[in-house]
UniProtKB/Swiss-Prot annotation:
Family: Belongs to the rubredoxin family.
Domain spans labelled Rubredoxin-like: 23-74
Cofactor binding annotation: Binds 1 Fe(3+) ion per subunit.
Keyword Mitochondrion on entry: no
Sorted UniProt keywords: Electron transport, Iron, Metal-binding, Plasmid, Transport
Full protein name: Rubredoxin
Organism: Cupriavidus necator (strain ATCC 17699 / DSM 428 / KCTC 22496 / NCIMB 10442 / H16 / Stanier 337)
Binding-site list for Fe cation: C28, C31, C61, C64
Cofactor: Fe(3+)
């Protein structure tokens, strides 16, 4: 069996924040809340301009409390 697709899904960064671009937007796969670094996260007092990879290790989705590892990378903005 080919394992090329096992453990991966389109948009996954596999919890490796080092693979993310500074301007990467990510979406919670539980509630679809979007983290946009241009906006930051006012709930967690994350300043605009903060990349997803620079979020604190304890950061969670402000909408559903999902773990950061549950986020998927979104494609480029149109």
């Amino acid at each position: 069996m080919n394992d090329a697709g096992m453990g991966r899904f389109e948009g996954s960064y596999l919890g490796d924040r080092g693979r993310l671009a500074a301007d990467a937007r990510l979406e919670c796969k539980i509630c679809w809340w979007e983290y946009d670094p241009e906006v930051g996260d006012p709930v967690w007092q994350i300043a605009p301009g903060t990349s997803f990879s620079a979020l604190p290790a304890h950061w969670r989705c402000p909408n559903c409390d999902g773990e950061a590892e549950q986020f998927m990378v979104l494609g480029p903005q149109a």
